[in-house]
């Protein structure tokens, strides 16, 4: 799964004939410059505008879940198995079997997942698009995807590319004798590339992403630009297994794998297939995105020999790890520990390792010539499993207990290819395993009767008469629901994990105030549930959201508007035992502009972190804008700070934030006392009127955000503001409710 990082791809050049496009280079130079080019510090709002729904050719009514559930999955699997051993002349299969190639494809599709922001992973099928389709580490996976095209063409919309890319690797393992624990569909296709921060480097295979302590900058997971994980020859090409182990532990940890899962994945994945380095990388042409149009999406055209088969160049490393490259075995671990390994170089010049014992030189069959034999190989990153004391202990245990190893690899593989899918409720198909795993963030099923409209009205009354303030109720509901990440579908209000470790202690959540609110809501919950004789219940997860809704309805009524905030019961309460504390720590908000909270450890500015938060919540620019304006007047800042509370009537839902922000009666200056704070003075009297953060003022300073702010500040926008705020609020409250579709509110003034 690891690919080399020597200057293999440095010789790539544009393969378009100048006689066909004589002014191509000139046209590139004359390409219009973006606003970001002219003003690099301008706040980038593009994350809130992707993906663009108009890019999807399937249309708004397309329901992928319905299509997938109508698919004959067994027929697809049989077609995949047949494909595995049907070698094509245009890209011959190693050992007559494409299985190892498909495993690598699946691994590299899913393995981009990272825990700190939930981005990456197989969902969307982004391996088809730039930059992933042209990463050095994904060399020749363009052929793997093209091999799958007849199957995708046959089954069409019933199976997405995203699902097919993963299913192919799973079936490959099964067809080669390994028993997986299942497969879940449900990954919808993306239709355009999206901008993701993959690192600061300006060149492929560079590594300039470490902080002063040598650790990867967050949220990155890979150690090198253009690689999935680490340099297989060792950090910076230095063949040091112990140093490689440190990098492996860091990067695999950032893709949600512990030490045992890491060893299982490497040892299991390298039980199959081989690496390819028949010659130097100088023979390779450009990656797909830079290749000539006549290549039709293919890249890395190889001018060495036949350019394929025995002459294939991918990573520059060359050889197989085991004597059974197309059959599941435990030979990888046997070889790792049974031999002493000596450093050598592949025909392509990459550093790798072979057994010291010359008797091992004919153990491994050749991929194409049955008369040839080879020695097994190991990479520096493989030897990390032997020499790192923690990895070695695990690997030896797996060697001595093959069944335990099989189970560990099956579980780690399933986690790898499903980690970015979110809760089990999103899983589709007949191959979904019945076992519930803690990394799936499970919640209990609804095994009771849900509350009806009369109950909801009664409960709202009790909440509003409990002594809890509008601010407290809104903040608690927001803190619970806004943990949701639309990248990997984690977090959200379902489960009421805000009452559990670690969320109950997060500084952004005002732990002392939160404990008071939860205690009051739990009392209301218990009194209601104990009074029911028909099995009806309200969960705390539902009650937290209902409390926020009730507070907003009251705040709108005080502004002169009657509105019902849509509420859909059905959330349940998770237990601490269902919650992996360490796993949830990465969801902690280090900044939340909606609550005017910012931890100075961030390496991005407060406005940038606001956009990041809104992006994770899948909000649009107007939704982000209206929510900030509403949260400010509802006095919902962390710590009850008054920054941006531009109203003399806090707790009442109105458009005062925008009206007062845009008023020319105020002159803004940087605070001379507090860094990052701004003070607004009355232009006539010089009296201090407001204090604000850069998150507040960005809605007046950024031209695009100001345009939206103006739309909510007009005299005729008061009802629209409330309507839009409630709709955006409901979107956040129901973001993790994959079982429903959010409803819009209706307003009466």
Swiss-Prot record:
Has keyword Repeat? no
Active-site residues, as the UniProt record annotates them: 108 (proton acceptor)
Indicate the secretion signal residues: 1-27
Cofactor names: heme b
Which GO BP terms, alphabetically?
Answer: cellular response to hydrogen peroxide; hydrogen peroxide catabolic process
Tell me the InterPro entries matching this sequence.
Answer: Catalase_peroxidase, Haem_peroxidase, Haem_peroxidase_sf, Peroxidases_AS, Peroxidases_heam-ligand_BS
Highest taxon listed in the record's lineage = Bacteria
Example of a GO cellular component annotation carried by this entry: cytosol
* Note accompanying the cofactor annotation: Binds 1 heme b (iron(II)-protoporphyrin IX) group per dimer.
* PROSITE patterns registered for this protein in UniProt: PEROXIDASE_1 (PS00435), PEROXIDASE_2 (PS00436), PEROXIDASE_4 (PS50873)
**Top enzyme category:** oxidoreductase
Which keywords appear in this protein's UniProt record, sorted alphabetically?
A: Heme, Hydrogen peroxide, Iron, Metal-binding, Oxidoreductase, Peroxidase, Signal
GO MF terms held by the record: catalase activity; heme binding; metal ion binding
Modification after translation: Formation of the three residue Trp-Tyr-Met cross-link is important for the catalase, but not the peroxidase activity of the enzyme.
Q: Which PANTHER family match?
A: CATALASE-PEROXIDASE, HYDROPEROXIDASE I, BIFUNCTIONAL CATALASE-PEROXIDASE
Name of the protein in its database record: Catalase-peroxidase 2
């Amino acid at each position: 799964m690891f690919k080399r990082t020597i200057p293999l791809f440095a010789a790539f050049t544009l393969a378009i004939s100048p006689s066909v496009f004589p002014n191509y280079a000139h046209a590139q130079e004359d390409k219009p410059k973006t606003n970001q080019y002219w003003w690099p510090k301008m706040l980038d709002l593009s994350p809130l505008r992707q993906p663009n729904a108009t890019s999807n050719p399937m249309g708004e009514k397309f329901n992928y879940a319905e299509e997938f559930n109508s698919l004959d999955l067994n027929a697809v699997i049989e077609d995949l198995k047949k494909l595995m051993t049907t070698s094509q002349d245009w890209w011959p299969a190693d050992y007559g079997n494409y299985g190892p190639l498909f495993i690598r494809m699946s691994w590299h599709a899913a393995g981009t997942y990272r825990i700190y922001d939930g981005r990456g992973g197989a969902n969307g099928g982004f391996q088809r698009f730039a930059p992933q389709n042209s990463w050095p580490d994904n060399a020749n996976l363009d052929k793997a995807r093209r091999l799958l095209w007849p199957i995708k063409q046959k089954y069409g919309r019933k199976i997405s590319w995203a699902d097919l890319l993963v299913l192919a690797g799973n079936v490959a393992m099964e067809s080669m004798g390994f028993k997986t624990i299942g497969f879940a569909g449900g990954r919808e296709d993306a239709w355009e590339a999206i901008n993701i921060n993959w690192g600061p480097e300006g060149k492929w295979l560079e590594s300039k992403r470490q902080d002063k302590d040598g650790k990867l900058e967050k949220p990155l997971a890979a150690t090198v630009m253009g690689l999935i994980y680490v340099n297989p020859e060792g950090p910076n090409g230095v063949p040091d297994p112990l140093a490689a182990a440190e990098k492996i532990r860091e990067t695999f940890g950032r893709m949600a794998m512990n030490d045992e899962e890491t060893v299982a994945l490497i040892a299991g994945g390298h039980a199959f297939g081989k690496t390819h380095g028949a010659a130097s990388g100088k023979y390779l042409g450009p990656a797909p995105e830079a290749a000539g149009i006549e290549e039709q999406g293919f890249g890395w055209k190889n001018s060495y020999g036949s350019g394929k088969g025995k002459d294939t160049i991918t990573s520059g490393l060359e050889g197989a790890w085991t004597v059974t490259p197309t059959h599941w075995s435990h030979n990888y671990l046997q070889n790792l520990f049974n031999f002493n390994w000596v450093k050598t170089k592949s025909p392509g010049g990459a550093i790798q390792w072979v057994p010291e014992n010359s008797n091992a030189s004919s153990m491994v069959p050749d991929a194409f010539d049955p008369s040839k034999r080879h020695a097994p190989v190991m990479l520096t990153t493989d030897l990390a499993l032997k020499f790192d004391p923690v990895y070695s202990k695990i690997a030896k245990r797996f060697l001595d207990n093959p069944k335990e190893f099989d189970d560990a690899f099956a579980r780690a593989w399933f986690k790898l290819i499903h980690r970015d899918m979110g809760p089990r409720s999103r899983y589709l198909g007949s191959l979904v395993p019945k076992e519930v795993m803690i990394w799936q963030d499970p919640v209990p099923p609804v095994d009771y009767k849900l509350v009806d409209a009369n109950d909801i009205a009664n409960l709202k009354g009790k909440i509003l008469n409990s002594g809890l303030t509008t601010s407290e109720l809104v903040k608690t509901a927001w803190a619970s629901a806004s943990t949701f990440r639309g990248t990997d579908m984690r977090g959200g209000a379902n489960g009421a994990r805000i009452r559990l470790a670690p969320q109950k202690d997060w500084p952004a959540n005002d732990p002392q105030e939160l404990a008071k609110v939860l205690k009051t809501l739990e009392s209301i919950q218990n009194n209601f549930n104990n009074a029911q004789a028909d099995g009806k219940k309200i969960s705390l997860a539902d009650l937290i959201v209902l409390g926020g809704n009730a507070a907003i309805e009251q705040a709108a009524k005080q502004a002169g508007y009657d509105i019902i905030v849509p509420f859909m019961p059905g959330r349940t309460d998770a237990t601490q035992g269902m919650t992996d504390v360490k796993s949830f720590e990465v969801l902690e908000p280090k900044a939340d502009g909606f609550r005017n909270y910012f931890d100075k450890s961030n390496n991005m500015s407060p406005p940038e972190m606001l956009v990041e938060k809104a992006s994770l919540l899948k909000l649009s620019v107007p939704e982000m804008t209206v929510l900030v304006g509403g949260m400010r007047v509802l006095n919902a800042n962390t710590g009850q700070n008054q920054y941006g509370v531009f109203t003399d009537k806090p707790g009442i839902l109105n458009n005062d934030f925008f009206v007062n922000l845009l008023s020319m009666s105020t002159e803004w200056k940087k605070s001379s006392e507090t860094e990052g704070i701004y003070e607004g003075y009355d232009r006539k009297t010089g009296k201090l009127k407001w204090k604000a953060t850069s998150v507040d003022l960005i809605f007046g300073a950024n031209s695009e955000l100001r345009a939206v702010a103006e739309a909510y500040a007009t005299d005729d926008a008061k009802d629209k503001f409330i309507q839009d705020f409630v709709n955006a609020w409901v979107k956040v409250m129901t973001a993790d409710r994959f079982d429903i579709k959010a409803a819009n509110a209706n307003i009466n003034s």
